[in-house]
């Protein structure tokens, strides 16, 4: 987005990510951005690595916003310990809230690209397509920012996500 001339601000909250908790990252871009903080009901897009996290952050999404999520289910600690069950019907519930849902098997696409670690890039590809941005701009950014030995794998992961976002 910076290559398109936008002002971009980022904020991360790591919480207990080292112990299986979530990492929250807020990204804002526009002509002039004063703060990366996004209040409930203001996000255009929620991008999530798994269904429960997508549902958890749904209150941040504005009406008519887009949820881009991996279809993978990652059991949180209460489910792992048997204290709770993983909720069923999350994707349907997200759609029921009026969100435009883009759910894809990002894990399989990342494996197809060459590494399960590329799930994030697959999801970014799908998000980029939902934004209507040109694929080439993102591929050039990958070339500029990713270590050379991982460029082709990341470009493939991005492209697979971009195509799945159609």
Predicted regions and their residues:
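Active-site cofactor/cluster-binding pocket
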Residues: 1-166
């Amino acid at each position: 987005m910076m290559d398109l001339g936008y002002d971009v601000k980022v904020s991360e909250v790591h919480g207990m990510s080292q112990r299986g908790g979530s990492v929250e990252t807020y990204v804002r871009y526009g002509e002039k951005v004063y703060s990366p903080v996004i209040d409930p009901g203001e996000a255009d897009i929620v991008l999530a690595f798994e269904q429960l996290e997508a549902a958890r952050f749904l209150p941040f999404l504005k009406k008519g916003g887009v949820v881009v999520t991996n279809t993978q289910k990652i059991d949180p600690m209460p489910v792992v310990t048997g204290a709770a069950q993983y909720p069923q019907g999350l994707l349907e519930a997200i759609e029921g809230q009026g969100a435009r849902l883009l759910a894809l098997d990002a894990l399989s696409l990342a494996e197809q690209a060459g590494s399960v670690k590329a799930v994030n890039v697959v999801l970014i590809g799908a998000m980029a397509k939902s934004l209507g941005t040109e694929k080439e701009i993102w591929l050039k950014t990958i070339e500029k920012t990713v270590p050379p030995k991982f460029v082709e794998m990341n470009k493939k992961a991005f492209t697979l996500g971009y195509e799945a976002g159609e």
